Amino acid sequence: TMNKQDLISKIKQLDGVTQDERAYLINLVNTKKKYGLVWEDKREDVEEQLRNNLPVLKEVKDKAIINGEDNPNHILIEGDNLHALTALTFTHEGKIDVIYIDPPYNTGNKDFKYNDSFVDKEDSYRHSKWLSFMDKRLRIAKRLLSEKGIIFISIDDYEQATLKLLCDEIFTEMNFVGNIVWQRSYAPINLKKTISQNHDFILIYCKQEFATLELNKLPRSE
């Protein structure tokens, strides 16, 4: 999926169209309205590196843990997550059944880096940077999911509503499975001026309609 600037660049390169036709198409892109999120896409340095370089995974044999030939093989990848996800599209596209991610929550408290710099609460492009960051990675994650694949995404109140809209756009509302609310703190906390929060969320989406998923396998407990 192209962002607006990439689409406009493609239109400018089209052959066989007049200047008036080109101007009309660009105006159409600029004025098109849609339901959902709109943000200013922010380029990442790691994304620019992918334009001319192919990420390659290198095995570090002295860190291997041998667990027997008949046991499952697992891979631990160290590196930038956008590079790692891109590399996996060459080997695991459409092959992964379950993905769990715990992305930066974008609280403004030095939990989110963009181009090697922390994004703080004073950054006027804070939400655009976070959305650009998440959009690129979630679209690749969707490619990695198998047809019966499902993804779990941890988040808190800062970006939960925004993330839901973004995921509805990427995975479609039809593939929204549910939103788990879980208690992350049991100690009394009074850090908020209004309502104290002791919970986080896990958004769940599947690649295809979740009617194909085998749900409700555990009996209801006391």
Where are the regions that the model predicts?
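DnaQ-like (DEDDh/DEDDy) 3′-5′ exonuclease domain used for proofreading
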Residues: T1-Y100, N106-W130, K136
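Beta-sheet entry/capping signal
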Residues: N73-I75, K95-Y100, K148-F152, Q160, ...
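Conserved nucleotide-binding/hydrolysis micro-motifs of P-loop NTPases
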Residues: P104-T107, Y158-Q160, S185-A187, Q208-A211
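Conserved Class I SAM-dependent methyltransferase catalytic core
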Residues: H127-I180
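Alpha-amylase-like alpha-glycosidases and glucanotransferases acting on alpha-linked glucans and related
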Residues: D120-L144, L191, S196-I202
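Flexible, glycine-/basic-rich loop-and-beta segments that form/coincide
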Residues: A187-E222
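Short, solvent-exposed loop/turn and secondary-structure capping segments
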Residues: L88, G108-N115, L163-L165, N179, ...
